[in-house]
Amino acid sequence: MAAELPFYIASSVEELVKKHVEGVEVDKNYSIFHYLSTCNNLVKQADIYKSEGDIERTYIYSLRFCILIFEKLQKHPDFNKESFTKSRNEIKRKAELKLKELEGLKETLKKGYERIQHKKEEERKRIEREKEKERIFKQEKLKLEREQQLLREEEEQRKREDLELESEIQRLKEVEDFENRKLQAQKNIKRATSARTFELLRQEALLEERKRLQGIETEKKRILAEKQEALEKEFQQQLFEQQEKERLEKERLEKEEQLRLASLPPPPPDYSSFDSDQLLNLIENNNKKLENNNQTDDKLDNEFLLDPSFLPPPPPIITQPSPSQEKKDNNNNNNNKNTTAQLPLSITQPPHMPNNEKKLPPIYNSTSPIQFGYPSLNNSVNNPPSFSLQNNTPLIQQYKQQQQQQPIQSPTNNINRPNIPQYNNYNAKPLSSNLNPLPPQYQPQQQQQYQQQQQQQQYQQQQQYQQQQQQQQQQQQQQQHQLPKLPQYQPIENKSISANGLAQSPAVNTPSITPTTNKPNIDSSEASKKYSKLRKIIVHGEVFQEFMRLAENNTKRSIETCGILSGTLSNDVFRITTIIIPKQEGTTDTCNTIEEHEIFEYQLENDLLTLGWIHTHPTQDCFLSAVDVHTHCSYQYLLQEAIAVVISPMANPNFGIFRLTDPPGLETVQKCKLKSFHPHPPVNGIPIYTKVDHVDLIWGKKSDSKVVDLRFLKK
């Protein structure tokens, strides 16, 4: 037995019994198993505190134990139940031993309290003696202080008289100095008045001169402003006239350009799709036409033979000409100032496809008139090209290959390209030989608006994605602050266990999580502050994994599994060392133990205390249902540190540790007589249960914790 600890709970045996033993009652609604477990807990705690030398707590738990056994528990209707005969006899035997120990403990407590009272009395007398000595010392000190006060008063009186004499002499000197300063001040005032008058006159003269100069300057500014305003009006009039002339000139040029474009001949047919026979027939027909045509060159222009498959050539690719080409262009422009660009018509080079060796088409801009490279009718008609049947087909194929290799420049790829006619389909046929359909025109503003809309949609999607990521991070941080998460549960196949201690198997179809109603905020500060300081409980997390492995068969069938948390007490700290899985009957929402005497007998044989209970929620979240709070009330009523552990493989986090608030949760559930599922609203804003803060959950360290399965124990 350890050394006896000093008494600290009470000052007498009567006070100890009144505060910590009286008020123990038996509730018939709680099973006899809970009371027998409580008796076992009491006697175990009494033995532990006795070994630690805590006589007061040993007496408290021993007296509670004896009162329950010999007075209160015999009134329970199941006390004489046959299945608990062995356990009941063992408890009675321990109660008789504790009853004998109580007399010795009571005498030890009385002697200890008497020693404490004697020490208190001695301390009181010592304090009185100290007070008497202090009183005499204060009287002598006060007398000495009075004598010293009289001496100080006489000295101060003498000093005051000396000070009064010095003060009178000083006053006379000050009067004389005052008269002298008064005379000097009057002289200074007269001198200052004269100087101020002179300064005022000088300032008035300066002010008049300044006003005169300001008037002259103002007049100059006014005249200058009038001249400037007249010049601006004249300049604006000239500018307006010049702009009007430019506008009229621009309109005239635009009309001339429109008339010139309207008079242009239609573009030549596309010879690239013709074979050699078609080209020969076309040339023969054209020659016959020309022989029969005796009109002028202008009429020949209008009556030029059009192929039914005619379409205007594709838009020229805008390229930057080389310096040599620019020089060549300038020479051609000087020779042909009033004509359009001319291209030779030959079988090897279509008119709308310039050769690399030929002159490049001019770069169009928005200010210069638009010109199309049509072939000259005079040259093409008067001097028809000669065709060779032997070389027709290879040349056409070569031309088609060049046309396929030639890159087609899209209008959208060059934002600086002028707004010129564009043709989308080069194989489409015109409605008639004399009517060309208007081609669609490229509109850069629509393209820019479309790109802006796409950018805005992408930006909004990015903002929504970032907000969702921030919300998920905040939820994860809140969950990490609440409780550590058990490794994700998975059902096992053929009892194969993974490296992290939980079972691994193919997925099993499980019902969806049942949505729960609005549960109270069990994490609120009010809920955690409403119960007194509790003794700490230490538990290793690996024992929960082992429990889930053994409960896997029920979990796959969506049936709840329960167990009893058992452990030891040392240095005022509980340690959960064993989870007992008893014989039980379970459904998807409830779990009831049977053959409870086996649990109690195992605890007696292994010196274990009941510290709470554990059960699973295969299809629900981690919380205490109405049935669960009534079940836990029987544990916490008999041991205020008792906890309830809920494991839900489908929740996140997948387990929780709870207890009833005290007050008001424990008292509320005790008074509730309803059965089955029913709501328990918060009381004055405080929920009836909360998460615990007196449990230390340890992971990764080696421990001797275990799970004992009594479900398959033979009778």
UniProtKB/Swiss-Prot annotation:
For this UniProt entry, the molecular function terms from Gene Ontology, in alphabetical order, are: K63-linked deubiquitinase activity; metal ion binding; metal-dependent deubiquitinase activity
Q: Which InterPro entries match?
A: JAMM/MPN+_dom, MPN, STAMBP/STALP-like_MPN, USP8_dimer
- A Pfam family per the record: JAB
Name any Gene Ontology BP term. Answer: protein K63-linked deubiquitination
**Regions of compositional bias (Polar residues) in chain numbering:** 339-349, 410-427, 502-525
Q: Where does Zn(2+) 1 bind?
A: H615, H617, D628
Q: Which SMART domains does the record associate with it?
A: JAB_MPN
Q: What residue ranges carry the coiled-coil annotation?
A: 86-302
Per the entry, which co-factors are needed?
A: Zn(2+)
Q: Which residues form the MPN domain?
A: 537-666
> Which family does this protein fall into?
Belongs to the peptidase M67C family.
Record-given protein name: Probable ubiquitin thioesterase DG1039
